[in-house]
Amino acid sequence: MGETNSRLSPFLTLISERPVFIILAMSAGADREGQFRRMRETAREIFQQALAEASIDRAFAQHVHCEHGVLRVREDLYDLQAYSNAFVISIGKAGHTMVQALTEQLGSSLEGIVATSVERSTQVRGFRYFRGGHPTPNAESIQAASAMLKALEAQTESSLVIFLLSGGGSSIVEKPIDDEISLDDLVATYSVLVHSGAPIAEINTIRKHLSSVKGGRLARRAFPAQQVSLLVSDVPDDTPDALASGPTMPDTTTVEDCYRIAEKYELPRQLPPSTRELFERHALEETPKSDDPVFHRSRWWLLLSNQTAVEQAQAAAEAAGFVVRVDNSCDDWDYERAAEYLLTRLRDLKKEFGRVCLISGGEVTVKVTNGGMGGRNQQFALACATKISGESVTVLSAGTDGIDGNSPAAGALADGMTLERARVRGLEAGIALERFDAYPFFQALGDAIETGPTGNNLRDLRILMAY
């Protein structure tokens, strides 16, 4: 009997240890899944903190003050008693939020016009509101432009005009330069531009020269009033005149740039006849430049930009214990190229530092060929998901305005378990990527970033973490 037990003991030991092995394996899997979940939560927290710290209310409280009838905007002082009146024009996705912040500093006696793309349940007293279209103009976009042009024409040399500009203004306020261009043709033209694959700066170059309000033409209508523009920017810091297509700033682009861009992306053959004719006849008119007298009484101040959001995300990631690096070099790159570049950079940084966070600002481009539901941030995140399966990597890409493409989301999260979790639910990342249909994919996983419209617009943030 003792001999039998001796012979069986290895098998008994093996049998008794096997459940331990299974339990340990399951425990390791659960720990790894828990780590991915915690990192997704951390990425969300970093993004949310960046939004909170780069808010419009904070920027106005820091840079705009009024005391004893004197308005201070950064380094400028304006004695309000020296002007016959002050009139405010607010344009863009942050139009309402900026007016609210301004009235908190100056009081409720202001009046003006607000054009934004978000429907408001409340409005600031004294202001006329328009809900313009985005990413393409609508009837109210044209009505807003007409109302602004008429109001600015009534301003005098003793008037102070305060312009509040934010992203999205290019379509939210619009009036074609040629009356022969109908709203339908204008919408068709915008659609061609948005889906051309061109970066926003090139799109805005053409928008300026097709518009009665862009490229400094709104400032021309306000002349000779004193003008000051406050900017919440969704364009690169070195091209401020691209914000809302620069309605109050000297235009650094030319009609020759327009013709070159149109040829580069083969635009004329895609445009409706009324706008195509302007390109074919080279009939576009030049916009006002920096030496134009209309800008002699104009000032411009940047209050917030993508760099602000990047810096706040960096601070939040450092507080979370990451070594942080910032790389904005892929701004305006194709999303696939940007994903490959940033992931390669992240892997290199991980070898050097271990727990590392790579933050990238700006925007990637997507040339849409199939009409699914999503946007550039979700498309970028999905592309990353297909490249990081099994890796201890988490990627968040989202827009600071809370809106990504034609979806309800601001962006999405992806990590080394995304494809595995998707397969369990019968989701195919490759099909969603090909169809530009990323939102249903991420929404089903619970990894869509849904903030709702934030009232701000500082371009996009990409947060990549390796651990």
Where do the protein language model's features map onto the residues?
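Short beta-strand segments
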Residues: 89-91, 113-116, 162-167, 229-235, ...
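A glycine- and small-aliphatic-rich helix-loop capping segment at beta-alpha/alpha-beta transitions
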Residues: 101-110, 126-129, 176-188, 220-224, ...
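Glycine-rich, mobile lid/loop segments that gate access to catalytic sites or pores
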Residues: 137-140, 150-242, 247-250, 434-437, ...
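Accessory alpha-helical/coil subdomains and C-terminal extensions
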Residues: 222-228, 250-341, 345
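Internal helix-turn-beta structural module
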Residues: 382-467
